[in-house]
């Protein structure tokens, strides 16, 4: 438990919701969701995504929050407080801590890319560049080890400085401000995209149901993609959101709070597409997926756009907030784990964490240049690809399966205790009739995602 035996808590309900949503909202909301939606039939994919968000993402989110709120600690401490005597569920707490560290070993580098591009647009570095030159900027950045390491270290130090100021004075205060600014920025960017000449065509491609695209991909593939997206968008399974449950009060039920987090996460993901597709269609540029969408396709769009320097800077400021909100949220979990497992105070946990992650982030930052010969997943792969594979394909689904089994089986905490914690407070309740689904169907769905990710 907390070394001072006095658990910190959020200063407001809004703080909890915005910080938790900030943890869930990240780079994948922007560079994956819109493209997958367009690829798999537009509105058809969105409907399947929302269905599986309710069937899979929301239940596991309530489980992480319930374990945190009832156990009043980070993953390992919470498991130990709730597990039956003699059981070893708390061992998963070490995997949660390792998962958060591994995630930050590459996420800090990618967040640094966002800051780099924000300053490039702000200072006019893209002004007058041809499409080929604009595309080449990304490769030049990746090949520069000093630049890559510099921004990774800046993000790492900034994150621990924020968390070092405490839960309310640091994480909650900065998180609320940053998420509020993020939501304003995304609305401004959406409105601007709607004014572009090809906006209608882009919006139709993105949101209107298109059975030909869906059947062309195969309906089974559409459903599988929707399952994956709804599950991974919340970053469940490594205790990243569980820690915020431990800082909650019991005034409101967990299904209601989890639903609010899901709504914010989905809102940002959908809005990202409302920005990207009208812009790409207006300038006849095909939207890609992943880093190439953010760092090659969109800079080309902005350089062709009236006032592109401003709109590019605002977009990458939005991306900086989206990524950094995840960084500080996961850092808080790492700090809490270190405090509870090793008995450190917050200052020591921040100092050691900052030094450790600055070093542990080097393989990813140098994996595109000095250590580019290291290709752990085969030719053309990078250290980032390998680290992301371990987190996304192993630790997230595997950890979510552990949380689920802990909350619904008699060998763990048990369904009745889980639902009692879920339903404490005012708001929507978790009904008892979901028990068979949680015990016999949901584990199979998560296992399918886990196995599929390993194949």
Task: Name the predicted role of every residue range.
Residues 1-31, 60-65, 69-91, 249-253, ...:
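Membrane-interface "cap" regions at the ends of multi-pass membrane proteins
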Residues 4-8, 36-40, 70-95, 108-168, ...:
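Inter-helical loop and helix-membrane interface segments of multi-pass membrane transporters/permeases
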Residues 14-52, 239-245, 256-259, 263-264, ...:
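Transmembrane helix-boundary motif of multi-pass solute transporters/channels
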């Amino acid at each position: 438990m907390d070394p001072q035996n006095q658990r910190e808590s959020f200063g407001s309900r809004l703080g909890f919701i915005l910080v938790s949503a900030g943890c869930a909202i990240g780079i994948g909301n922007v560079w994956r969701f819109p493209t997958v939606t367009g690829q798999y039939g537009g509105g058809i994919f969105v409907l399947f995504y929302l269905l599986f968000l309710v069937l899979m993402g929301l239940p596991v989110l309530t489980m992480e929050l319930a374990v945190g709120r009832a156990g009043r600690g980070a993953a390992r401490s919470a498991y130990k407080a709730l597990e039956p005597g003699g059981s070893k569920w708390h061992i998963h707490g070490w995997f949660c801590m390792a998962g958060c560290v591994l995630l930050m070993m590459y996420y800090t580098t990618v967040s640094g890319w966002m800051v780099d591009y924000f300053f490039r647009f702000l200072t006019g570095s893209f002004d007058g560049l041809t499409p080929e030159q604009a595309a080449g900027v990304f490769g030049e950045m990746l090949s520069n080890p000093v630049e890559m390491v510099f921004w990774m270290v800046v993000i790492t130090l900034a994150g621990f400085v924020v968390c070092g100021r405490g839960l309310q004075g640091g994480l909650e205060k900065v998180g609320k401000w940053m998420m509020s600014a993020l939501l304003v920025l995304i609305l401004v960017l959406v409105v601007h995209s709607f004014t572009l000449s090809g906006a209608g065509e882009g919006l139709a491609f993105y949101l209107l149901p298109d059975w030909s695209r869906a059947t062309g991909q195969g309906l089974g593939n559409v459903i599988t993609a929707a399952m994956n997206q709804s599950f991974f968008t919340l970053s469940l399974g490594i205790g990243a959101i569980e820690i915020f449950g431990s800082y909650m009060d019991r005034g409101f039920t967990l299904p209601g709070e989890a639903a609010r987090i899901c709504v914010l996460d989905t809102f940002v993901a959908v809005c990202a597409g409302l920005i990207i597709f009208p812009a790409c269609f207006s300038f006849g540029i095909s939207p890609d997926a992943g880093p190439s969408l953010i760092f090659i396709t969109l800079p080309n769009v902005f350089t062709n756009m009236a006032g592109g320097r401003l709109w590019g800077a605002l977009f990458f400021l939005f991306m900086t907030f989206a990524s950094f909100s995840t960084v500080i949220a996961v850092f808080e979990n790492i700090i809490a784990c270190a405090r509870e497992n090793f008995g450190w105070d917050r200052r020591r946990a921040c100092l050691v964490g900052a030094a450790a992650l600055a070093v542990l982030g080097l393989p990813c930052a140098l994996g595109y240049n000095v250590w580019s010969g290291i290709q752990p997943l085969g030719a053309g792969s990078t250290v980032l690809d390998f680290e992301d594979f371990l987190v996304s394909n192993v630790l997230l689904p595997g950890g979510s399966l552990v949380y689920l089994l802990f909350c619904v089986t008699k060998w763990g905490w048990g369904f009745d205790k889980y639902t009692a914690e879920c339903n404490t407070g005012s708001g929507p309740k978790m009904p008892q009739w979901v028990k068979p689904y949680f015990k016999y169907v949901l584990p199979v769905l998560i296992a399918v995602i886990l196995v599929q990710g390993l194949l």
